[in-house]
Amino acid sequence: MKCLKDGHMHSHYCPHGTKDSFQMYIERALDVGLDEITFTEHMPLPGIFMDEKLLKECSPNEEEILLYLKEATKIKEEYKDKIKINVGLEVDYVEGYEEKIKKMLDNYGEYLDEGILSVHFLRLDDVYHCLDMSVDEFGIIAKILGGVEKVYDKYFETLIKSINADLGSYKPKRIGHPTLVRIFNEKYPMDYKNEALIDKVIKKI
């Protein structure tokens, strides 16, 4: 029997998401026939490596994430007879902050059923850029690297680094939106041909 699952859901704790309650997400999941869902709110970022105002829009802070984990755990128990709910985090891989990410995962690990590991940030000569922040920012990244194809290369190379990184025993086993680099494909179309690099990513996943 096929199990219908949504393994990447955010919550009202997400600064750039909706304010819909856990109950609204769950009731909608039941309405469309899902058997299992995973809440994967963004884990707090591991440091201030870019504009602080921008970073505050990316994830809950440490106080908020504890509230999220505790509320999600409570909701999971309340609905256990209706739907399987997993409590998780979306862990943003930030190159150079591996040790801090590992420590944070150790702190939150007791609450986690699963998680996803994602790449939103690219480090270019020790300056960080948010890949999916805006079309304009994507264009800046492409200009620095020397073209859109180079952005794809850098993204997939960073994705491989995230998979190889030692993030401890609570490191997520799933990769979030591995084609995120295509987010502005309408503005920056690319028929990406680096099959060798894509094969490396697929083998790692």
Where are these regions (language model features)?
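An N-terminally biased module of ancient metal coordination in phosphate/nucleic-acid-related enzymes
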Residues: 1-95, 99-103, 107, 184-204
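Domain-core and long-helix interface of multi-subunit machines
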Residues: 13-15, 111-205
